[in-house]
Amino acid sequence: MFLCVPHYTSITFPQLNDGRKVLRFGSYQRRGFRILAMSSSVSEASNYITAAPIFLPDGPWKQIPGGVTAAKGFKAAGLYGGLRAKGEKPDLALVACDVDAISAGAFTTNVVAAAPVVYCKNALDMSKTARAVLINAGQANAATAKRPSNDYQGDAGYQDVIECANALAKLLQMRPEEVLIESTGVIGHRIKKDALLNSLPKLVSSLSSSTEGADSAAVAITTTDLVSKSVAIESEVGGTNIRVGGMAKGSGMIHPNMATMLGVRLCFLHVLFCKVVTTDALVASDVWRKMVQIAVNRSFNQITVDGDTSTNDTVIALASGLSGSTRISSLISHEAIQLQACLDAVMQGLAKSIAWDGEGATCLIEGSSLVNAATIRIWRYRGHMAMPTGPLRIISLHLWYWAINHVELCFAAVYGRDPNWGRIACAAGYAGIPFQPNKLHISLGEILLMEGGQPLPFDRAAASNYLKKAGETHGTVGIHISIGDGAGRGQAWGCDLSYDYVKINAEYTT
């Protein structure tokens, strides 16, 4: 079994001659795996993969260990089942709930959606609850067979998913539609079904509510990730302590464009990623699905690494209701607002970890933007939709996203430690948001580069050093764009674009 180094501690391995702490993120040798995996006799683990740094926003919650198993009623496991093309890192993960959990999902809008994506959407249409999520790494099970029209019943990959779901449901003694399945890996490859089916009994028997169970599952879903991504928080909702936890994978093919089962398009943006979120809060099905919609829009749909929208993007969120909290039946209740904040925090923390771990990246880019009321009036007039999180916020996110996260030139400039703000101004101009050029402000960290549409003299050496320091420590570069002084604010996240990104992806399947 593989274990994650807990991300709420810092562990030193004596095997490292220089005694560096594994969680000193600036010391990573990116993509070389030279210090990220090492042998150990601790427990039954033969290797460790470190956990991503935690990027939780500030709020009335505390971080706790446990990931997807922190919430009451959930167990998890991860093991090697022979699905990976190379190595013996775990490649099968299972998250299960002791009771029927209220379920929600968000999925890629890519037309070539993977078989498990279609299966999960169908399952969520059939049932408001689910009790298990099975995830395999190695094969995406997307674009796996020809089929007439949109009939997935004739898709061999889809039939593989059904067979795996039925087998797992039998072992867990639940209905097949209560089993959800996610896949990640190489597109065009079907699941190694025989290997997966043979591994299910051991996977089920390994289920544990411990932190180790959650960590092993978080490791099992990784592919090109250098770190596992798992987090959990505890907070008070309506006078009762509830927990929200989650795990995610993603490093390349990151450009989410997901919609929920409500059929609402979530974003203006566009990972090959899989995510599972759990909570023990008690919440009505329709409210939970709307909450997940909002949280995904504020988190995973605001990140990008390479502008590539995957066939497999999936978020599954389960609520066991075992915390003893009062049932949340209204989206505008005080308790719902509290739970929404917790859900947002966990998803944002995981989303930022994905951007931080972008393939070949040396730093996280965090952008913020500001728009005014005049802009939103023009936006509405032109017929663009307003989202539940507030139209000013969405337009602000849209501006930031297109101005920074959709432009490889900006990513490359950050990697080159070049404070070339002209690329940012140029991209803002074609973001599709109408504004007066004399209202444009751009800053890099605390360094103001443009104000009122006019370039300002600034210390280029200091700006370059700011970027250099972030790259050397795998820190964060902050970029702010403003086209007004109104209340429309938003954030989004990306990473720099390095030579290593090209190398990693040029050699991905070879």
Swiss-Prot record:
Catalytic reactions on record: N(2)-acetyl-L-ornithine + L-glutamate = N-acetyl-L-glutamate + L-ornithine; L-glutamate + acetyl-CoA = N-acetyl-L-glutamate + CoA + H(+)
Keyword Chloroplast listed: yes
Pathway given in the UniProt record: Amino-acid biosynthesis; L-arginine biosynthesis; L-ornithine and N-acetyl-L-glutamate from L-glutamate and N(2)-acetyl-L-ornithine (cyclic): step 1/1; Amino-acid biosynthesis; L-arginine biosynthesis; N(2)-acetyl-L-ornithine from L-glutamate: step 1/4
Swiss-Prot/TrEMBL keywords: Acyltransferase, Amino-acid biosynthesis, Arginine biosynthesis, Autocatalytic cleavage, Chloroplast, Multifunctional enzyme, Plastid, Transferase
Pfam families: ArgJ
Domain of life the protein comes from: Eukaryota
Biological-process GO terms, alphabetical: L-arginine biosynthetic process
Site, Involved in the stabilization of negative charge on the oxyanion by the formation of the oxyanion hole: residue positions: 184-185
Entry's Gene Ontology cellular component terms: chloroplast
Location in the cell: Plastid, Chloroplast
Enzyme class, UniProt record, top EC level: transferase
EC code(s) of this entry: 2.3.1.35, 2.3.1.1
Site feature Cleavage, where: 259-260
Residues reported in the UniProt entry to bind substrate: 223, 249, 359, 505, 510
GO molecular function per UniProt: glutamate N-acetyltransferase activity; L-glutamate N-acetyltransferase activity
First-listed, main subcellular location of the protein, grouped into a coarse class: plastid
Gene3D superfamilies recorded: arginine biosynthesis bifunctional protein suprefamily (3.30.2330.10), ArgJ beta chain, C-terminal domain (3.10.20.340), L-amino peptidase D-ALA esterase/amidase (3.60.70.12)
Assembly description: Heterodimer of an alpha and a beta chain.
Protein role: Catalyzes two activities which are involved in the cyclic version of arginine biosynthesis: the synthesis of acetylglutamate from glutamate and acetyl-CoA, and of ornithine by transacetylation between acetylornithine and glutamate.
Family: Belongs to the ArgJ family.
More details: This protein may be expected to contain an N-terminal transit peptide but none has been predicted.
Full protein name: Arginine biosynthesis bifunctional protein ArgJ, chloroplastic
